[in-house]
Amino acid sequence: MSINATLFVQAIVFAILVWFTMKFVWPPIMKALDERAQKIADGLAAADKAKSELSVANKRVEEELAKSRGESAVRLAEAERRAQALIEEAKAKATEEGSKIIAAAKVEAEQQTVKARETLREQVAALAVKGAEQILRKEVNAGVHADLLGRLKTEL
């Protein structure tokens, strides 16, 4: 065979190889590449969707946190207000109780003062009678002189 015939036969074999490759090899390779490209595109789309969902979820979390902080601040303020009210109520009760105790002590002191004065009057009257008895050198009868002794007590 000459170089021309070999070249012609090689060209025909090459053409058959190209046709065979285009007909049977190329379509599955292109299909696999297209499927892979589609999977990559779907993965990127899913990643973008997940990213947007994540940002939405983060916004919701921030809103919930802000809401929770606000609610906790309100509850804390309410608790402080209640505590202050309880403190004021306790102070008022303590003041009232202290006033009652002071009033009772004043009444008791007044009663003791009156009792002490009465006892002192009786003792002074008895001393006055004894003094008069000593002066007169005779016994003074308390039953007979009760009116006189009563006037002495009131004067003292």
From Swiss-Prot:
The keyword Membrane applies. It is a single-pass membrane protein. The keyword Cell membrane applies. Keywords: ATP synthesis, Cell inner membrane, Cell membrane, CF(0), Hydrogen ion transport, Ion transport, Membrane, Transmembrane, Transmembrane helix, Transport. Its main location: membrane. The chain crosses the membrane at residues 7-27. SUPFAM superfamilies: F1F0 ATP synthase subunit B, membrane domain. It comes from the Bacteria. GO terms for cellular component: plasma membrane; proton-transporting ATP synthase complex. It is found in: Cell inner membrane. One of its GO terms (molecular function) is proton-transporting ATP synthase activity, rotational mechanism. PANTHER family: ATP SYNTHASE SUBUNIT B, ATP SYNTHASE SUBUNIT B', CHLOROPLASTIC. F(1)F(0) ATP synthase produces ATP from ADP in the presence of a proton or sodium gradient. F-type ATPases consist of two structural domains, F(1) containing the extramembraneous catalytic core and F(0) containing the membrane proton channel, linked together by a central stalk and a peripheral stalk. During catalysis, ATP synthesis in the catalytic domain of F(1) is coupled via a rotary mechanism of the central stalk subunits to proton translocation. Belongs to the ATPase B chain family. NCBIfam families: ATP_synt_b, PRK05759.1-2. F-type ATPases have 2 components, F(1) - the catalytic core - and F(0) - the membrane proton channel. F(1) has five subunits: alpha(3), beta(3), gamma(1), delta(1), epsilon(1). F(0) has three main subunits: a(1), b(2) and c(10-14). The alpha and beta chains form an alternating ring which encloses part of the gamma chain. F(1) is attached to F(0) by a central stalk formed by the gamma and epsilon chains, while a peripheral stalk is formed by the delta and b chains. This is ATP synthase subunit b. It comes from Polaromonas sp. (strain JS666 / ATCC BAA-500).
